[in-house]
Design a protein with these regions (language model features):
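Residue-level detector of short, conserved catalytic/binding motifs and their immediate flanks
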Residues: 110, 161-163, 167, 215, ...
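N-terminal auxiliary "cap/dimerization" subdomain that precedes the catalytic jelly-roll/cupin core
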Residues: 1-84
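Signature of the catalytic double-stranded beta-helix
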Residues: 55-132, 150-151, 157
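Residue-level signal for short segments within beta-strands and strand-turn junctions
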Residues: 116, 182-184, 246
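Short His-Asn-centered micro-motif
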Residues: 115, 165, 219-221
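Catalytic core of Fe(II)/2-oxoglutarate
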Residues: 190-257
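Catalytic core of non-heme Fe(II) oxygenases with the double-stranded beta-helix
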Residues: 122-210
């Protein structure tokens, strides 16, 4: 089930985007995956997909040392620049759960997905076409699997009812959102890889959950989902979101990415 919580004001979102842009030298290019490539006889273009922050599903799954390196370098920056938004997020979720919520200090802090060009440039036509395709994988969130050793340091850990959340900071002109399905699937098969043959196995119809700027969307557990592609994208469109996960450890929700 999808839950919605108004989290940031318009002013907050504008301030956050400005800070994200000012940190663009720290953006990590994630466009190397083939599904983000536009290829013809003349060139191969990479659609602009970046993250600000270390990411379990991109870094730790491929190279745990890279995840550790990124989080060690970027966590202090994120805390310095975005501690105020972490306080808001924790406060909002504490109201939702009636339980303590903290930013975990050991794992990577919640960060940003950035589907956009850097300030001063616009999306090229081939990028617009790519972003109107379903680039995101159909998957369930199992990022916690990358950190089993850490979870074992706590007495009680709930890895069934884990938290995933997204907060849109900027959205394309015609919006964005999340597809979800009710199907119960094998996480090993419905992971972060390509979508080949996945949709053929699903019995339930997809549900379109449209985003609202500044409004958190979150869910608990292994909900099957996929990033919705763009619609009638414009060269100046941007899709910037805060992303994070949470695990309840010894009665405290610990947020990470």
């Amino acid at each position: 089930m999808i839950h919605r919580v108004k989290t940031f004001t318009e002013e907050d979102c504008n301030k956050i985007e400005t800070i994200v842009d000012n940190l663009d030298k720290l953006w990590i290019n994630r466009s190397c995956e083939r599904r983000f490539a536009f290829e013809n006889s003349f060139k191969i273009s990479r659609a602009p997909f970046w993250t600000l922050g270390a990411v379990s599903y991109l870094d730790s799954t491929q190279d745990p040392e890279r995840y550790a390196k990124h989080k060690t370098y970027l966590n202090p920056v994120l805390i310095k620049k975005f501690n105020w938004i972490y306080e808001i997020i924790c406060e909002k979720l504490q109201r939702e759960f009636s339980e303590p919520v903290v930013i975990d200090k050991f794992l990577a802090h919640p960060g940003f997905h950035i589907f956009a060009t850097k300030t001063g440039s616009v999306l090229e036509p081939e990028y617009l076409k790519l972003f109107e395709e379903p680039l995101g994988s159909v998957h369930v969130d199992v990022q916690y699997e990358e950190h089993y050793d850490y979870w074992h340091s706590f007495k009680e850990v709930d890895l069934e009812n884990t938290l995933s959340f997204t907060i849109p900071i900027n959205l394309p002109t015609h919006g964005g959102g999340l597809y979800t399905w009710e199907d119960i699937v094998d996480p090993l098969l419905f992971n972060y890889t390509t979508n080949e043959n996945k949709l053929d196995e699903l019995e339930s119809p997809s549900v379109s959950n449209l985003y609202n700027k500044g409004e958190m969307i979150y869910f608990i557990g292994h909900l099957l989902h996929q990033m919705m592609p763009g619609t009638q994208l414009q060269p100046t469109d941007r899709r910037i979101t805060v992303q994070g996960h949470g695990v309840k450890c010894d009665g405290v929700w610990r947020l990470y990415w």
